[in-house]
Amino acid sequence: MEIAAKMVKVRKMEMILLLILVIVVAATAANVTYDHRALVIDGKRKVLISGSIHYPRSTPEMWPELIQKSKDGGLDVIETYVFWSGHEPEKNKYNFEGRYDLVKFVKLAAKAGLYVHLRIGPYVCAEWNYGGFPVWLHFVPGIKFRTDNEPFKEEMQRFTTKIVDLMKQEKLYASQGGPIILSQIENEYGNIDSAYGAAAKSYIKWSASMALSLDTGVPWNMCQQTDAPDPMINTCNGFYCDQFTPNSNNKPKMWTENWSGWFLGFGDPSPYRPVEDLAFAVARFYQRGGTFQNYYMYHGGTNFDRTSGGPLISTSYDYDAPIDEYGLLRQPKWGHLRDLHKAIKLCEDALIATDPTITSLGSNLEAAVYKTESGSCAAFLANVDTKSDATVTFNGKSYNLPAWSVSILPDCKNVAFNTAKINSATESTAFARQSLKPDGGSSAELGSQWSYIKEPIGISKADAFLKPGLLEQINTTADKSDYLWYSLRTDIKGDETFLDEGSKAVLHIESLGQVVYAFINGKLAGSGHGKQKISLDIPINLVTGTNTIDLLSVTVGLANYGAFFDLVGAGITGPVTLKSAKGGSSIDLASQQWTYQVGLKGEDTGLATVDSSEWVSKSPLPTKQPLIWYKTTFDAPSGSEPVAIDFTGTGKGIAWVNGQSIGRYWPTSIAGNGGCTESCDYRGSYRANKCLKNCGKPSQTLYHVPRSWLKPSGNILVLFEEMGGDPTQISFATKQTGSNLCLTVSQSHPPPVDTWTSDSKISNRNRTRPVLSLKCPISTQVIFSIKFASFGTPKGTCGSFTQGHCNSSRSLSLVQKACIGLRSCNVEVSTRVFGEPCRGVVKSLAVEASCS
C-alpha cells in the first residue's frame, strides 16, 4: 500500500509538472493569422519591416552582429531562403553545420528579439547554383522539376517535411514560442508557370496543400503567384510593389522581395540603387496599403565555394545592400532607411486600423490618409513626377515635395521624413593593402615563399572513360567539379592542306559554356568564355601523324532561373571540326571516340586541404602558365577589420584559405565600357542597368576571407590558377571605414525623426529645425578636422564640395567649434546659427569631416 501511495504521488507530481510545462509553452506561443490589412500576432495587426540575410553567405561568427545591425536599422523580421543543395549535398546525407546551421541562425534572430520569415522553397533562385536544388535531384529516374511530376513532388515533400520537422523539434515556429511567423513554399513560379501548361495549376495546388498539411501553426505565402490558392498569401517581388494587390480581399498586401540593388556578374559593371529611390519605393508601398515589406538583400554576403549560380554570377553577392558584403554599414543607405523605418512605425496605429483614403493633389501628386476612430491620423504625400518638384496644399498647409519623393506625416500635420532628403552622413570606406609576406616585405619577394604543382594537361586519372561523340557536361560530372576534360587523339596525314608550309589548321569549337581552353599537343592554343554559347575558331599548328587535342570545359555556376532551367546544359556539344585556314573541306571531330575525365587530379588528391609531398618549392616559380596549383603561408593581417584578398595579377581559378573555399576568382573578367555615369539620377523608375559603375574595370578583384577562418599565423592559401597568372602579385586588404564623413542638409529638410516620440508628437519643440548630424562610426574615433563647411548654396558631392555664390563666412568656424574633438555633433541648419548670407533662396549646410 505504501509503495502504491508513493506511485500515486509521483504520478500526480508528473501531471503537475506537465501542466506547468503546457502553461509555460502556451504563455510564450504566439497566434499568427492574417486579415486584409496585415499579419495578426496575438490578435494585434502588425506593420512589419523585414530584411534578407542568407545564412550560408556569411559565417556563424558574423551572424550575431549582422542580426543586431539589422535590428538597429529598424527591422522586425529576418528573411532567409533554405538552401537544399547545402543541406543535402548527397541524397539522405544531411548537413546542418557551420554556415548551414539553420537552427542556430534562427535562434540568434530570436535572441535578438526579431521574427523570422522562413522561405523553404525548396526552389530558391537566389543567384545560387542550380537554383538551390542539389544536382543529384537531376538524376532521379523520371523526374521533371517544378511540375505535376510524382518523383519531383516526392522529393520536394520529403525535404520540406525535413525542414519543418527540424524547426518543430527545436520549437522555432511562433505557434511553439519561436520566432518563425511565416513560411514560403515555391518561389516566383508564376513568372514562368505558363511554360508548364495545365500541369502547373495542379502542381501549385498540390504545393499549397502539401505545405498546409505540415501544420506549422503559422501562415504560408507564395511569391509572384497570382493564383495562389487560399489560404496561401500571394506576395509581390520587384523594384516597386505599390500597385500590387493580393488575389483576395481577405489577404494583406505583402512585399517579399524589394530589390535593394542588383547582383553582379563576371564581365559586368557594378549595379547600385540610390537610397532615395529605394526609400521612395518603400514609402509608396506603405502609403498604398502595404504592411509587410522585405529588403532583398539587407546583407548580401559572399558566394563561397562553388555556390554562385547564373551562370557567371560573381563570388561577391554584395547586392548594394544596407549592410555590405563584409558586414559593414553602407552609409547613407543604412541610416536613411533606419530613419524611414522610424517614421513608418510612428504611423503604425493608423496604418493597421483602416485602409487609406487616397486623393489627388494635382498631376502626379497624391495624398494617402489613415485615420482611426480614436483620432490618430497619419498621411503620406507623394510626388511621382520624375522631374518637377512641387508645392502642395494639404489640410490647409503648404508642403514642398521634391520630384519622385514621399513625405511622411505621422500626425497629418508635420513632416517627419522625406524620402529624397537624407539626414545620414556618407561614410567613406577603403581597402588598405598588406603584403602576404610575414615581415611585411614587398610582394615582389613572395616567389621564394610559394610552392607549386603543375596540373597535368589532359587525361591523368584512372577513372577516365571512353565514349563516342560529345557529352553534355552536367550529365557527365553531376557538378562534382567545375572541370571536364574532352581528349582526342587524331591522326593527320601528310597530304592535308593545313600542313602546307606557312599554313595553319583552324579548330572550330562550339560549347554551351561557360569557359573552354584548347590544348594542342600539350600547349595552350586558345580559349573563350560565354554565358550561354561559345563559338571559337582557333588557329593551330598540327604535325604529321598523331596529334592530341585536349579541351578543358569549365562551368562558372549552373543556371538558377527560368522555365526548365535544369535542362539548359553546359559543356562542349559541338560541332567540333578541323579545317584549313585557306578553306576547303573540314574534318568532323565531334563524332569520334573521346576520352573523358571528370575533375582535376589535384582535386582528387585534395591539394586544397591535404598536405602533399608533391609540392615544389624551388625557384624560379612558374608564372603566367595555365593549370598550376600554388600554395603559400601567411600571417593574418593585423587589426580586426574585415579581410579580403586582392587577386590582381592572377587570371582565373578557385582559392582556399585553411581548407575553406573562398570561391571562384576571376580578376581578368573586365566589364564593358558602356552604361556607366558619374552620378545616377534617383528620379524615375529604377531598373537593373540604370545605375552602373566600374565600367572598363575588372568586375571583381577583392574576395572576402572571413576573419574567423584565419589564425594569427601559419595560414595556408592554396589556389588553382587555370588561366595563367602571377600569384606573387596577390595582396591582402583590410576594409577600413569611417575616416571621412560627408553630409548636406538644407533648410527644407524635416527635423531629425528622432525628435518624434512614439505617440506621433514632436518631443522637443526647440528642435523643429533641420539638423546636420555627424558621428564617427567607431567608438574610439573623434572628429579631428573639418575639411569643408559651407552654409549657403554649396555645390558638388562628397570629396568635391565647393562654395556656391552664397556662403556664410562663419560656416567653417562654427562647425569646427561644434564638432572638433567629439565623436558626434549636431549643428542646426538655420540663419539663427549662421546668419543670413543671402535672402530669397533655400540654403544648405554641406560638411566634410575626418575622424581620427
Swiss-Prot record:
The active site is at residues 188, 257. One of its GO terms (cellular component) is apoplast. Expressed in roots, flowers and siliques. Keywords: Apoplast, Glycoprotein, Glycosidase, Hydrolase, Secreted, Signal. It catalyses: Hydrolysis of terminal non-reducing beta-D-galactose residues in beta-D-galactosides. It is an enzyme of class 3 (hydrolase). Its EC number is 3.2.1.23. One of its GO terms (molecular function) is beta-galactosidase activity. GO terms for biological process: carbohydrate metabolic process. Residues 1-29 form the signal peptide. InterPro entries: BetaGal_gal-bd, Galactose-bd-like_sf, GHD, Gly_Hdrlase_35_cat, Glyco_hydro_35_CS, Glycoside_Hdrlase_35, Glycoside_hydrolase_SF, Lectin_gal-bd_dom. It is found in: Secreted, Extracellular space, Apoplast. The keyword GTP-binding does not apply. Glycans are attached at residues 31, 258, 475, 766, 807. The keyword Hydrolase applies. Residues 766-852 form the SUEL-type lectin domain. Belongs to the glycosyl hydrolase 35 family. This is Beta-galactosidase 8. It comes from Arabidopsis thaliana.
